[in-house]
Every structure is written in C-alpha cells, then in structure tokens.
C-alpha cells in the first residue's frame, strides 16, 4: 500500500468515510475538501499543529457542527441527519473532559449508564469492569474534583468502555499529561484496539502517536498533505523506511537478503556487515535468510522511520535525519 493524499477515496470497508469534507466559516476555510477512510479495528491519527482543522473534522463526524460541503459517514450513518445514532455507537473524549466534579467517579459513570437505559445489574457490571481496565478502582468513590488531568482522561476512557462504543474518538488525549501518565494512557488505547475498538485520535505530539497508530493523516491549513503508515510515508518523503543492519558470517548472504520482499537496497559494509533499506521491519526475514545459507548470525538492529522527520521534511523543508534508533 502506498501513501495517499486528500484526493484518495476512502476504502469500501471503512467504518468512517469522508469524501470532499469541507467546513467554512464565512470566507475562512477550516477544513478543505478532505477524503479519508478508517477501517474497523484501526488506530488512525489526525496529526498537525493547533488550528490545522483536526478538531473541526472531528466535530463534523459527530454531527456537532454543520458540514459546508462534501460528506462523512460513521458506521453507515450520516452525522448531520442521525447524530443520535452516531452518539449511540461512538465514544468521544474531547480535549477538556466534562464530568460532574461534585460526584464520584462511579457516580459519573452510573449517570452515563442510566441514560443508556441499562439495568442496575448491568450498570454495576460494566462500571466495575471499566474502572478496573483504566486502573481507577481504588479511587472509584472519590470526587472527580480531586482527580488529576491524567485520571480524568482515564475516566473518560472508562465512560467509552461502559458504552461499549464501536468507535472511540479522542481529541488531543495526551495533551498536558506527564510522561508516565502519557505512557499509561497510550497503553490503554492499545488495549482498546486489542478489544476490537476502532480508534481515531488527533494530536500534535508526533512521537507519542507514532507508537500506537496504524496509519496517520498529516494535516496542514485544513488539508491532508499525506496519509498512510509511518513506513509508507518514510519511503515517500525520506526515500527510506526501515534501515536494518545485519552482522553475520557466511557466503551468499547479501544476495539472499536482497530477495526479501520489501527490501529495496542491500549494502555490504564489510566482510560480515550488511545494511538493508526496507519498507518494513524485516529483521525476522533477515534472520531466516542468514540461516537459509548456513550463515552464522551475530547481530541484528533496526532504525525506525521517525514521524517527526517526515513531518519536518513535508511541512518545513528541513533535512533532518530520517530514523529513530531502536536496537
């Protein structure tokens, strides 16, 4: 799959599909004819600086602001015509989470569950499960007014879990969190994905988003400049995706490495050292290739493409190093 731009139509199996989506405020264009699709179970990132159009795009998906032109579909529903249906299936975590500060965490979730029409028994089961999954069981009976921002964000995810939302839309979810809280929150997002939830998140914190997103759309001035996986964007923008170094003894290793699918270049650095440029992380394939020619593998390492370098090259024209090391 190659990187895409805003003119690429969404895939037919998309659970969220936007086509030519546009939002104008008078003469100002906040979102300019964007098209994209998000598949079931995918973590998709809307990335870009503040004011790039990410939040406005989210609000149109939720039916919370009018669409000027174009269309968007969420699980087959038109948010402009059926906002309540979208709300029933989608969990939304805004940049500033709104809870009743005078109520406890459990009471806030109980209020949400009651509005959903759940029985008392079902409410209790879902709330206990949600609080456990976001690690808030011990503070379930504390007032939300005493919560840190990180705890509020986790409570927001708990509400999405209580709803059993098919899609979770998270607007700048890690903004303002300390490093440890950020790590914990990103892991919770990964857990949602493993449970089959489709996740759309917006952020300007590139390194954090790179850890969890399957694909990203890079926003600038209301338009999608590029879209795809980080590896795909790296090949298109930086000319390389993953760089894998192999240290191994044996004959015919370079030739065997060059036959691995996704490898675009193999360099011989010394008698037993090789560098591969590839569209994906090919370390398992490289190890198998060395074994296949009866070689002796000594070391494997990979340099991953950096989303920050891709972003800088795309939007700022900076010629930065295109990799982030990971042994």
What role is predicted for each listed range?
Residues 2-6, 278-327:
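C-terminal coupling/interaction segments
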Residues 13-18, 23-221, 226:
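ABC transporter nucleotide-binding domains
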Residues 186-277:
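ABC transporter nucleotide-binding domain
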Residues 5-14:
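Primarily ABC-family ATPase nucleotide-binding module
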Residues 19, 75, 269, 301-303:
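Solvent-exposed beta-strand sheet faces enriched in polar/charged residues
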Residues 91, 108, 117, 156, ...:
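A generic structural signal for secondary-structure junctions
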